[in-house]
């Protein structure tokens, strides 16, 4: 895997990141864990997430993707080996 500097942070991130917008809706936790394991084994250390994930946003699943990522990091250890890019959409009608 090729790694690139993340600005002037001193961090190096993999040239590829793992997108997670389906974790918690289209993919259950076991499937998400398998995808995260595969990404780790391929040398990926960069995960893309968002507070509104999974897509399509629903009040009952909002934030579930980040919960799954957190559970995976806790179960696998070494959370400092990862860079997680996340974003916030902000208030939306019908969402908490």
Where are these regions (language model features)?
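N-terminal binding-site loop/beta-alpha segment at the start of enzyme catalytic domains
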Residues: 1-83
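A short acidic, helix-capping loop that chelates divalent metal ions and anchors anionic groups
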Residues: 53-57, 91-96
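A short, structured active-site edge motif that brings together acidic residues
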Residues: 81-92
């Amino acid at each position: 895997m090729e790694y690139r500097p993340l600005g002037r942070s001193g961090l190096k991130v993999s040239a590829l990141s793992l997108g997670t917008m389906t974790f918690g809706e289209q993919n259950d936790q076991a499937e998400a864990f398998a995808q995260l394991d595969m990404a780790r084994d391929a040398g990926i250390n960069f995960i893309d997430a968002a507070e509104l994930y999974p897509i399509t946003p629903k009040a009952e699943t909002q934030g579930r993707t980040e919960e799954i990522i957190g559970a995976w990091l806790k179960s696998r250890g070494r959370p400092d080996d990862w860079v997680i890019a996340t974003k916030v959409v902000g208030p939306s009608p019908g969402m908490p």
